[in-house]
């Protein structure tokens, strides 16, 4: 098994974990927890990534928690934090987990240098000492300990609130750190919404993020039955709050592409993700496009926005036989296909 660079540097420092009950969190993408479990008392995972949760939920040896907040009781006395792409998400996870685990908790932080992992030095200052103990593979390995009482964590304090103006409608948006387009109206989403036809029936908002697209669709087309899905628990929590803030109804749930969805959508609408961590990542969107026909009703329609450089039309044409470009500007294109 080839481990990620942060896991490889952690593997060099296994002595730090001996005798510990380790809770792993953050931007973890490989099977390293199985290796780590051989060297510590117990290993558990807290993840906001539904795909990663499903991967580990099948194994009894490592307990895996999924959600936007760790609410379960744990005996962990050490956190292994894989530094996430967004600094604000790192701060959110750190504050939440230390509030849960409490004073005297040890922490190891690993991450690629270009991800900004050095920020942990200032971020952890109010909790206790932390120092870098290793550097390799353009990554850093920090160890520290919480010597101060962590403040009480209230998730509601972490929602960023902002407004989106679309046509004559004002949408109140509530967004947690780590959610796509946190705090702003994405220009691709705006072009997508400007291009959408009148919607009816069962509509899927794939990769719902903070819930902007779904909320606008439901506001303009109040009779639709709206499903909103995302792989991120932070996005799910944000979309639920955004719907609530606008007195809108929709079904919001985690799904690894179509793993938990139905198969009778009149419309699948998406501003699909193509960044996973610091790397460009297409596989989930490819699955979205390839399997769209079997998840649409007769004459059902797929409509998505994408950066112009992404090679989605050939995938859509292979799945549907045709791909239309409904609109474009200097950065984005709106693609459509009908079953």
UniProtKB/Swiss-Prot annotation:
One of its GO terms (cellular component) is cytoplasm. Its EC number is 2.1.1.172. It catalyses: guanosine(1207) in 16S rRNA + S-adenosyl-L-methionine = N(2)-methylguanosine(1207) in 16S rRNA + S-adenosyl-L-homocysteine + H(+). InterPro entries: DNA_methylase_N6_adenine_CS, Mtase_sm_N, rRNA_ssu_MeTfrase_C, RsmC/RlmG, SAM-dependent_MTases_sf, Small_mtfrase_dom. It comes from the Bacteria. The keyword Lipid biosynthesis does not apply. Its main location: cytoplasm. NCBIfam families: PRK09489.1 (NF007023). This is Ribosomal RNA small subunit methyltransferase C.
């Amino acid at each position: 098994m080839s481990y990620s660079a942060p896991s490889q540097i952690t593997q060099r420092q296994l002595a730090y974990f001996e005798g510990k009950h380790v809770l792993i969190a953050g931007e973890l993408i490989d099977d390293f927890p199985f290796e780590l479990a051989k060297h510590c008392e117990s290993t558990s995972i807290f993840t906001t990534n539904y795909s990663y949760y499903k991967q580990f939920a099948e194994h009894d040896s490592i307990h895996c928690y999924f959600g936007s907040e760790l609410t379960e009781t744990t005996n962990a006395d050490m956190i292994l934090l894989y530094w996430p792409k967004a600094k604000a998400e790192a701060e959110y996870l750190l504050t939440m987990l230390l509030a849960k685990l409490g004073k005297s908790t040890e922490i190891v932080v690993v991450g690629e240098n270009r991800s900004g992992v050095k920020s942990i030095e200032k971020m952890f200052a109010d909790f206790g000492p932390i120092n870098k103990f290793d550097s390799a593979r353009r990554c850093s390995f920090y160890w520290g300990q919480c010597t101060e009482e962590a403040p009480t964590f209230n998730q509601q304090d972490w929602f960023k609130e902002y407004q989106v103006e679309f046509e004559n409608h004002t949408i109140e948006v509530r967004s947690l750190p780590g959610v796509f387009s946190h705090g702003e109206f994405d220009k691709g989403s705006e072009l997508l919404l400007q291009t959408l036809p009148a919607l009816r029936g069962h509509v899927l908002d794939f990769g719902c993020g903070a819930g902007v697209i779904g909320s606008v669709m439901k506001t303009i087309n109040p009779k639709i039955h709206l499903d909103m899905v995302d792989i991120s628990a932070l996005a799910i929590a944000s979309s639920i709050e955004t719907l609530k803030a606008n007195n809108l109804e929709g079904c919001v749930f985690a799904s690894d592409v179509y793993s938990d969805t139905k198969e009778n959508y009149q419309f699948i609408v998406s501003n699909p993700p193509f960044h996973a961590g610091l790397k460009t990542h297409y596989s989930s969107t490819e699955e979205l496009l390839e399997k769209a026909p079997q998840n649409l009703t007769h004459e059902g329609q797929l409509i998505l926005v994408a950066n112009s450089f992404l090679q989605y039309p050939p995938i859509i044409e292979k799945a549907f036989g045709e791909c239309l470009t409904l609109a474009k500007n200097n950065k984005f294109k709106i693609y459509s296909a009908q079953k």
